[in-house]
């Protein structure tokens, strides 16, 4: 299984910030963030491993992950201490997860909060589910197009799998 072996993938990475404890990578779409049997070795995890020079004691510590089809800044802690600090910060008002999305169909309101629980549908699919986990997405429509699409600014209050997709489809 190629996913079980860490394999350097020398992709050209855009790294807008790096210090001894933290690396911030501009993850391109459609690059997967982590290795898995389905993704093979072409992942951000393998690219970061190569970027850091293939250290012997490498542990991949993403602070949060972006879906395969999502591009954006993704923080990766370079040690356990920073990972713990960032994980604590992740659930505070100080850590802002904001996105721009083009939606098929525009939200009815120009701005609002989608506060609907998200649960598992089948496998990795997610949906609005009364018994699901709480999920909060703040949104503001920046531009509406004649074709029904919209450019929407989104800020996550929680970080559920596929939260933006599920909430924008609700």
Annotate the PLM regions.
Residues 1-170:
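RNA pseudouridine synthases
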């Amino acid at each position: 299984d190629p996913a079980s072996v860490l394999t350097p993938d020398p992709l050209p990475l855009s790294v807008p910030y790096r210090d001894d404890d933290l690396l911030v990578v501009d993850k391109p779409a459609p690059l997967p963030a982590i290795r898995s049997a389905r993704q093979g070795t072409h992942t951000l995890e393998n690219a970061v491993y190569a970027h850091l020079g293939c250290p012997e004691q490498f542990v991949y510590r993403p602070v949060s992950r972006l879906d395969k089809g999502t591009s954006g800044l993704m923080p990766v802690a370079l040690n356990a201490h920073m990972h713990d600090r960032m994980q604590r910060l992740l659930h505070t008002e100080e850590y802002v997860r904001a996105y721009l999305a083009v939606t098929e169909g525009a939200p009815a309101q120009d701005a609002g909060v989608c506060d609907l629980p998200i649960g598992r549908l089948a496998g990795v699919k997610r949906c609005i589910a009364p018994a699901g986990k709480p999920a909060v997405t703040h949104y503001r429509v920046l531009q509406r197009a004649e074709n029904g699409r919209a450019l929407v600014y989104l800020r996550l209050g929680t970080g559920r799998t596929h939260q933006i997709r599920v909430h924008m489809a609700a």
